[in-house]
């Protein structure tokens, strides 16, 4: 991700700082480099005059229109925007070097609240979501990866094991207060 702070990317990068996936990425950056290191990276990115968007899909649309060279988005937005437009977009998916924070893998989870009034129904829903048939549909329809069936992968993408995600404790990424405060401090939100 450090290469994005180089002057060659001035005004050519799109980000969505209010988006939860970008904030999870910044939380991982804080975890990896500490708050001062994350602030330094954000300050360098801001100095490079990135284009700010509300949503990842807007970044993909801007790359497709030739308004940006690249954007930091979740990979599945390429398919989402292509589907909405009814054609392939010019934006392409690329990955950072192995272990780079730019390869962060966000996850979605499900659980049953202790206070649930319908624990049996909630557990059935989770079992359904984790079933092989649902996971296959999840991969084919949303173009996201399955952590339950890692051998499944979205079409035209490398296997998850080949992406070489950074070592990040994902359980720490849910608390976004520190991240949001840092984004406010550097003037991104």
Regions flagged by a language model, labelled:
Residues 69-90:
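A ligand-binding cleft/hinge motif common to bilobed small-molecule-binding domains
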């Amino acid at each position: 991700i450090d290469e994005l702070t180089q002057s060659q990317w001035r005004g050519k990068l799109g980000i969505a700082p209010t988006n939860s996936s970008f904030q999870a990425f910044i939380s991982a950056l804080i975890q990896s480099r500490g708050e001062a290191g994350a602030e330094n990276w954000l300050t360098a990115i801001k100095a490079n005059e990135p284009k700010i968007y509300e949503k990842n899909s807007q970044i993909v649309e801007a790359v497709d229109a030739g308004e940006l060279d690249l954007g930091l988005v979740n990979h599945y937005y390429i398919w989402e925007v292509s589907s909405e437009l009814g054609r392939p977009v010019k934006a392409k998916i690329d990955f950072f070097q192995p272990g780079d924070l730019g390869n962060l893998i966000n996850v979605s989870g499900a659980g049953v609240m202790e206070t649930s009034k319908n624990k049996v129904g909630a557990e059935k829903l989770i079992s359904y979501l984790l079933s092989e048939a649902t996971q296959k549909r999840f991969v084919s329809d949303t173009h996201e990866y399955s952590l339950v069936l890692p051998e499944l992968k979205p079409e035209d993408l490398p296997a998850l094991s080949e992406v070489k995600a950074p070592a990040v404790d994902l359980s720490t990424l849910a608390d976004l207060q520190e991240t949001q405060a840092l984004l406010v401090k550097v003037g991104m939100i």
